[in-house]
Amino acid sequence: KVIALTGSSGKTTTKEMLGSILSRLAPTLITRGNLNNDLGVPMMLLELRAEHQYAVMELGASHQGEIDYTSNLVQPHVAGIINIGTAHLGEFGGRDGICRAKSEIYAHIVPSGTSIIPAADDFADCIRESVKTEQCLSFGEGGDIFATEIVLHPQSSTFSLNTPQGVRTVNLPFAGEH
């Protein structure tokens, strides 16, 4: 299964966290460094092997159409936008343009796939308009998946992860609210 992520910020952290979790379950290919553009994504796909059960691909964009191109290459089973911010604002003519560019990630998701959207983002409605899959989950405040009972310790974080399937306690080995 291919999981593709994009967003204005937090892509690399999210990719690394998800890749770390999936690597415990099965062999997983994870985008290295910032090989997340129209040159880096094909390079990463060349590393995909038969033993990989998962691929966590970070898709970045510095121009319109780049995520459409890379999403078409990876054909994700799960695709998600982390947020719509102001990175590369000039190249896209404003946050509306950034939203359109990031939403290209849903253009090539497999028909039975799952789309993930940020519930609390100012552009959540704009993002949702681009979703083509039946299965769509939102995360964050007001979403289908959200955290409660967040406790920050000096070297770790603990919280309850609420999902449509139930609630699980999560312990992260680092401090901070992410």
Specify the residue positions occupied by each region the protein language model found.
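Adenine nucleotide phosphate-binding catalytic loops in nucleotide-utilizing enzymes
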Residues: 95-96, 135-178
